[in-house]
Amino acid sequence: FAAISGIVVAGTAFAPHWLLQLPVFFALALLFIAVRRLSGIHLYGVGACFMLAWLLPTTYWYYYFMSPGVAFGASVGWALLQANLFWIIALRRYIRTYGAVVLFVIAWCTLTYIRTHAPVVEDWWIPHLGYSVWRNDSITMWSAYGGEAVLEAIVLLCGVSIAWLIVHARMSVWIRMSCGLVVLVAIANSIV
């Protein structure tokens, strides 16, 4: 599921219409469901698989101004570095699943905030999760309150919410709630 989720997230970054970007939420939900029972090195492996499937296709333009080896190394290096965030999910043994998921989202968004504001790395061209919703005005308007980190928090929390519904609610409930989320985003997008 990790590779499929990564490919879907990468694909939504290139979607020509905001409606085609909605699968990002379900792709992340599948990712969160896949990691909920894993521990240790398996979490890192799934995280690395997801990050590589997402970042390698979205850094295609590195090859235009870097040598192939440097471009590939930069993409793989960042993917493997960011996959370390998945170790946080192993903390669920100590702080329960909800605490680990919240800490994961906070850590991801903090890393993004630092990456986009720190003096040396602010100009690094690394794809953001927010690219997967960049055509959706009802979501991107929230970037005024914290930039890319806020967009990533919204995308991650929507994925977590859908994963929770799939795991904990009856089938009819999660289908209705997931469809409701999609309809809510669609309505909000048409208003903005």
Residue ranges: model-predicted function:
Residues 1-192:
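Membrane-embedded alpha-helical bundles of multi-pass enzymes
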